[in-house]
């Protein structure tokens, strides 16, 4: 089975609406630099199609997925890590106003399910049979659909919980496993006091990890109150990881804010991270699990 990375940007995409800084103006002048919000497309061994996250840029993500051989549309299932804008604002595209889908299994936490039930534009999709919520049990592997040939496991990860809780997801195939963790508040809260990042990934039996790389450092968003948008910076994460050593898992960063210099392949930051042996995730990358 295979996983396609359908987007690498933070919720607002790149370029971001309202940003007139050079970072986004460059992307407007050169559309090939643009990036879509984080999302995964998964093709099961039985040919079934599954998505993680439901972005409003789903049309472009479908085109990208189709270019590498997406199996079927609409997907058999969608899984949501949490409730924030860029991870859920495309749900309505499955409804009667656009695709007119039916019977899409929506995997999420019970906390996210409560929000679905209390949000009219989503609850009506449940009533109409467009989506069928299915609540996962944290840390318990499950098949998104019977016979798909892979499992998902939801890992609780602290992140702003004003709307719902937040989870990372482990996708486990016959050969390898991949951790998808676009959002977290801090490594201290995620790991606790005893584990390091590599120890944690080893305990989860993860071969590939796509992790929160929202900000390179907080200097890039000096006009914002960072307590309102907590994420560990990439520089902090690199300090905890050190240089990659033989036997370490494959770790790549995702969920880049539009200000993040890792969006520019020629930047010093991009070069520094690469020299340490870690990865900058590429939109359209395919992982065979």
Regions found by a protein language model. Name each.
Residues 177, 185-286:
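Cap/insert and terminal regions of metallo-dependent hydrolase folds
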Residues 1-67, 135-196, 202, 285-289:
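Core dinuclear metal-dependent hydrolase active-site scaffold
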Residues 51-55, 74-87, 107-109, 179-184, ...:
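Active-site neighborhood of phospho(di)ester-bond hydrolases with catalytic His/Asp-centered motifs
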Residues 132-134, 152, 275-280:
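Active-site regions of enzymes building and remodeling cell-envelope glycoconjugates
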Residues 110-121:
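A short, active-site helix/loop in glycosyltransferases that binds the activated sugar's phosphate group
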Residues 46-107, 207:
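Active-site metal-binding motif and surrounding structural segment of the metallo-beta-lactamase
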Residues 18-21, 65-68, 92-96, 120-123, ...:
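Short, glycine/charged-enriched secondary-structure capping and boundary segments
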Residues 15, 61-63, 89-91, 117-118, ...:
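Short glycine-/acidic-enriched loop or helix-start segments at secondary-structure transitions
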């Amino acid at each position: 089975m295979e996983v396609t990375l359908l987007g690498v940007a933070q919720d607002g995409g790149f370029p971001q609406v309202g940003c007139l800084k050079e970072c986004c103006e460059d992307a407007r002048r050169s559309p090939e630099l643009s990036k879509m919000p984080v999302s995964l497309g998964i093709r099961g061994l039985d040919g079934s199609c599954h998505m993680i996250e439901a972005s409003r840029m789903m049309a472009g993500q479908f085109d990208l997925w189709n270019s590498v051989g997406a199996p079927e549309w609409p997907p058999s299932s969608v899984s949501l890590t949490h409730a924030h804008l860029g991870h859920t604002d495309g749900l309505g595209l499955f409804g009667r106003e656009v695709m007119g889908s039916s019977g899409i299994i929506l995997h999420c936490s019970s906390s996210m399910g409560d929000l679905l039930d209390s949000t009219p534009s989503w609850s009506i999709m449940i009533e109409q049979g467009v989506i069928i919520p299915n609540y996962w049990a944290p840390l318990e592997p499950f098949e998104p659909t019977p016979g798909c040939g892979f499992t998902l496991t939801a890992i609780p990860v602290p992140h702003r919980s004003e709307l719902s809780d937040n989870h990372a997801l482990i996708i486990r195939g016959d050969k390898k496993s991949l951790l998808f963790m676009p959002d977290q508040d801090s490594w201290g809260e995620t790991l606790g006091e005893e584990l390091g990042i590599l120890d944690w990934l080893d305990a989860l039996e993860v071969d590939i990890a796509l992790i929160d790389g929202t900000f390179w450092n907080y200097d890039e968003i000096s006009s914002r109150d960072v307590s309102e948008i907590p994420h560990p910076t990439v520089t902090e994460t690199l300090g905890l990881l050190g240089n990659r050593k033989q036997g370490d898992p494959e770790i790549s960063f995702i969920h880049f804010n539009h200000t993040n210099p890792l969006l520019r392949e020629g930047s010093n930051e991009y070069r520094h991270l690469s020299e340490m042996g870690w990865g900058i995730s590429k939109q359209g990358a395919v992982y065979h699990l």
